[in-house]
Amino acid sequence: MTQCSAFSGIFFRNWIFIRGVPTIQFLPPEGPPEIAFAGRSNVGKSSLINALVQQKGLARTSNTPGRTQELNYFVPDGFSGSKEDFPPMALVDMPGYGFAQAPKNLVDAWTHLVFNYLRGRTTLKRVYILIDSRHGIKKNDEEVLDLLDKAAVSYQIILTKSDKIKSNMLENLMTTTQMSLLKRPAAYPELLTTSAEKALGLEELRTAILQAVVQ
C-alpha cells in the first residue's frame, strides 16, 4: 500500500477546527504537514475547504471581504496531537488578500501574518493559490506568487468557480495561466480547476494534496 492510499480516507473523516492564529506568536508548534489555502477575498477558500472534506459548516464563509482575519487550522478528529499521535495533516485557511474596504491597520496586520507564516513554516508542504476563473491572476496574486518564489515555498494554482464561465474561456485562461507560471520556480506546473458549488475537481485536488503531503 502506498503512502497516498494509506491516507486516502482522511478527507472523509470528521474534521475539526483547532486554532485561530491572529498573529505569528500564536502559531501552533510545528507538527503534522500543513496544506494552506490562500487567495483574494471571497475567492472561495472556505467553501472549497468545506467541499473538500464534505462538511458544509467547517470553515466559515462570508460575503464580507476580509472576514477571515486569522490563520484557521483544521485537522481530522480522533488524534491526540502528541508526537506519537499527530494527525496526518492540517488544512490552513489563510486570510484573504486584496480587500479594498478594510482599514489600513488591519490590512497591514493581516499582510504581516500571512507573509511571515509563508516565509518560516518548515512543515508547510504546499500552498494552494485560489484564482477566480472569472477574473484570472490579478496584481495582488502576482505579489503573493513573487513572495512564494522568493521563499521557495511550493505552490499550485487552483482556478475556482470554474462552472461560472464558458468552457472555451476556461481553456484559454488555463493556457495563459500555465504560460505565466513557466518563469516561476516554486510553481507546481499542473493547474487544478474546481467548483465547490458543483463539486467539480475535488477528487483531483484530494489526490494532489496527498501527493504533496507524502513527498
UniProtKB/Swiss-Prot annotation:
SUPFAM superfamilies noted in UniProt: P-loop containing nucleoside triphosphate hydrolases
Domain of life (superkingdom): Bacteria
Secretion signal, residue range per the UniProt entry: none
Residues engaged in binding Mg(2+): S46, T68
Keywords carried by this UniProt record: Cell cycle, Cell division, GTP-binding, Magnesium, Metal-binding, Nucleotide-binding, Septation
GO cellular component, one term: cytosol
Keyword Manganese: no
GO biological process per UniProt: division septum assembly
Cofactor(s) in the UniProt record: Mg(2+)
Residues the record lists as binding GTP: 39-46, 66-70, 93-96, 160-163, 194-196
Stored InterPro entries: G_ENGB_dom, GTP-bd, GTP-bd_ribosome_bio_YsxC, P-loop_NTPase
GO terms of molecular function: GTP binding; metal ion binding
Domain EngB-type G, first and last residues per copy: 31-215
Listed PROSITE patterns: G_ENGB (PS51706)
Function: Necessary for normal cell division and for the maintenance of normal septation.
UniProt-listed HAMAP family: GTPase_EngB
Family statement: Belongs to the TRAFAC class TrmE-Era-EngA-EngB-Septin-like GTPase superfamily. EngB GTPase family.
Protein name: Probable GTP-binding protein EngB
Gene name in the database record: engB
